[in-house]
């Protein structure tokens, strides 16, 4: 079970450390203090994950069982790579038999078994390059993509929802039948057209906010399970609704 860490880490460093004022702005100091005292950050370091985001995926999987049996996975917005680390492990991906393809416009250090493309997913060539890198239809498409925040909540929501929509259409284009799609979104409502499209193509569509997401964060995840296949009839039963779970 993925339990929230408490107290101190196994290295003996206690939570609640302060950063000396020095020349740092108050906002920067608060961010650093929050980061170094975050139990998920400390746990990620101890368990060898590149970011605390690993526990978001593990927690979602613990409840919704999306990773077991996956043979190929595509990871969008992959840097720094914690989701790709998990994907490589569950698919038994190796450099000689890569089963994970990842993409980000940011640099990412190599991960064994992960074919990484440093490019913008919105580049017209990106989808085809990902399909070539994975060597077959993926069982899962993951997207942790988010547009750089502006501080204006509605603007940030619209920009990130655009990335979510592009990722969703890509997932429908490439997923193996029975596959799953998981994408970051922001609180503020998922676009009706996107939800309708996902419900038409997947057996179940839900919103998820894992405990490892910071309490003050507006991020949520949109999970679509059980891809019906590209030949699914429009007369199929609609998917279960996108309630928060």
UniProtKB/Swiss-Prot annotation:
One of its GO terms (cellular component) is cytoplasm. Keywords: Cytoplasm, Methyltransferase, rRNA processing, S-adenosyl-L-methionine, Transferase. Its EC number is 2.1.1.166. Gene3D superfamilies: Vaccinia Virus protein VP39 (3.40.50.150). It is found in: Cytoplasm. It catalyses: uridine(2552) in 23S rRNA + S-adenosyl-L-methionine = 2'-O-methyluridine(2552) in 23S rRNA + S-adenosyl-L-homocysteine + H(+). This is Ribosomal RNA large subunit methyltransferase E. It comes from Sinorhizobium medicae (strain WSM419).
């Amino acid at each position: 079970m993925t339990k929230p860490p408490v107290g101190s880490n196994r290295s003996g460093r206690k939570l609640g450390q302060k950063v000396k004022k020095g020349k740092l702005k108050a906002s920067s100091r608060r961010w650093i203090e929050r980061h170094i005292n975050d139990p998920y950050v400390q746990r990620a370091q101890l368990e060898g994950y590149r970011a605390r985001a690993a526990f978001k995926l593990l927690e979602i999987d613990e409840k919704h069982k999306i990773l077991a049996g996956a043979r190929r996975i595509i990871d969008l917005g992959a840097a720094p790579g914690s989701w790709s680390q998990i994907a490589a492990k569950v698919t038994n991906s190796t450099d000689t038999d890569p089963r994970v393809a990842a993409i980000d416009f940011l640099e990412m250090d190599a991960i064994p078994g992960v074919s990484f493309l440093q490019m913008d997913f919105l580049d017209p060539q990106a989808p085809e390059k990902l399909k070539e890198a994975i060597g077959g239809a993926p069982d899962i498409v993951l997207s942790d993509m988010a547009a750089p925040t502006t501080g204006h909540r509605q603007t940030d929501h619209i920009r990130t929802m655009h990335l979510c929509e592009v990722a969703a259409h890509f997932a429908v284009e490439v997923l193996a039948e029975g596959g799953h799609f998981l994408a970051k979104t922001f609180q503020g409502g998922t676009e009706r057209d996107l939800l309708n499209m996902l419900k038409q193509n997947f057996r179940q569509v839900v919103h998820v906010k894992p405990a490892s997401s910071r309490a003050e964060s507006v991020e949520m995840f949109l999970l679509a399970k059980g891809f019906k296949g590209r030949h699914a009839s429009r007369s199929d039963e609609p998917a279960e609704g996108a309630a928060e779970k």
